[in-house]
Every structure is written in C-alpha cells, then in structure tokens.
Amino acid sequence: MSDSIDTHNEADISVISYMLDAVRHGASTVHILSDDTDVFVIMVYWCWKAGITTNLQMEKWNGTVLSINATAKNLGDHCCSILAMHALSGCDTTSYPVGKGKVSAIKAMRVVPGKLLHCIGEAEATDLQITKATRTFFLTLYNQSNSVTLDAARYDIYRKRKRPPALKTLPPTERNMYLYGRRAHLQVLLWKAADQADPPAVDVTLFGWEKKMGLKEGEELIMPTQDSSPVALPALLDVVSCGCRAGLKPRTSAKCSCAAAGLACTSYCSCKGNDGICCNILTQQQEHKESDEGSGEDDDRTDEDSEDEEAAFC
C-alpha cells in the first residue's frame, strides 16, 4: 500500500484513495467496514468511474454487507450524478432539505434532464452552470418544475397550502440556494479528487464558506456563509406578521393580526412566535403539534429515511 496517497484532510476520501490503490495493486476483493453513507456513495461513484471489476464491499456495523458493484450496475450512468445528488440532499458537510430523504433525492436525480448535474464538482464549471443545476435539482425535488425560481416555488407552495407550512419545509431561497450549491460543488470537487495524490488547493471563501475568529486566541473557524436578505418580499412579511411584542401588555388572541388572519405567528412577528410572549393560540397549537411529531433533528426526515440510507440506492 502506497504511503504517499494519504494526504487528504477528509478521512472518507482517504479511505477511497486506499481503495483505489488496492485495486491498482491487483486486490481481488476490497472490504471496507463503515457506517458512513458518504463512503458508500463515493465507493459507488468510483466503481463506475474507474470501471472497477474488483469485488468491492462495504460492511456496516450491524454486519450487513453491501455490494458496491451491484449498486453501481443498478444505477448505471446515473452514477455520474450520484455525488452531486448526495451533496445537494445532505452529506457530512452539507445540510439536508427537511422532509426530503434519499429516496426522493434519487428520484429527482433520475428526472433531472440529461447531464445537468454532471458539472457539479468539475473544476471548470461556471457559476451559471452550478446555479442552474442546483436550482433544477431542488425544483424537481419539491415537485415545482413549472416554477422558474426557488423564490417563486416557495410562494407557490405557501399559497396552495390550506394551513401555513413550517418555514423549514419550504425550498431554500434563491440566494441560499446559490451559497448551498457552491458548498456542495466544493465537496464533490474533493470527492472527485480521491484518485489524486493531493486535494485541490482551493479558497473555501469562494465556495459558500467564511472564516471567523474563534473564542481561543489565534483560532480560526470556517462557517457557512449566511444570507441576510429577507426570505420573502417585505410587503408580504408585513401582511403576515403582527406587532405583538415583549414589554407590552399581552394582547388577546382576538387582537393579534396573525390570529385574525388564521395564521400562527412566526419569527417575523414582533413577538417572534415566542411561547412566553406570543398570545396567538394558533402558534401554541402549532408548537404542540411539532412537539408531538418529534423534537430531534433526525425527526425532520421522512418515513422513507430509515437507518439504512444505503438501501435507497439499491
């Protein structure tokens, strides 16, 4: 095994580098023990990309052995888009769209026209190509292919619901989609460099990340760039927000403009929808409903997302 290939900062990529090295040295079987979906997806991609016939297996901690070769064969040419799909729908370094799991993401990948997703992770890809690919993927994922932008899709979804949907269930805004697409592009760029001795030298601040000083002296943190633009038109926020706020005598629900409109209060209201301040009974009902549905971060996943995410690819 070559010692010179393990120069990547990510352990997942190092695992793939050693896998490729083992294949080059004539290994008949490469058996990797991992519970990481990222590792599984990257293995499938490289099995297809490099045309590997060596028996590739990934064993999960529960003893389940997954055939990488069979998965790559099942996906066929869609393997070319699998890294982009995985990064856009949530991986170790990117967040995931609430309520949209890998089953939905794979269906969207199969529907996205032609080779549109292929540009993600390619060094020569332009901002325009990455943005178009990311937008198309999310519009497809949310069944909003008739919309031109994600902002329009958000409005359309909100308008068609009988009750206001939780904001976290809406597609990202156009600006956040752009930043998110850049972060996904960078991650796929690194995954696609697993066969190289060194990872590509990049400035992460050009890919939806920003550097900030940590609490410790000399500590530098890399954080996702946050967009400060409004999530909806100011006029719309004025319509669906109330003026109830802390420091004033609590208003009755009947006097709350949101309650009068049949809406729960949100963070855009003066009361911020805060349980200790908000008097809107609809807000309280929504909070209780969300609490009953589950409070953990993983509970935002849909029923299609079992613990065995890899099964969605097979």
Where are each of the predicted segments found?
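Noncatalytic, typically N-terminal accessory segments of nucleic acid-processing enzymes
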Residues: 1-98, 102-314
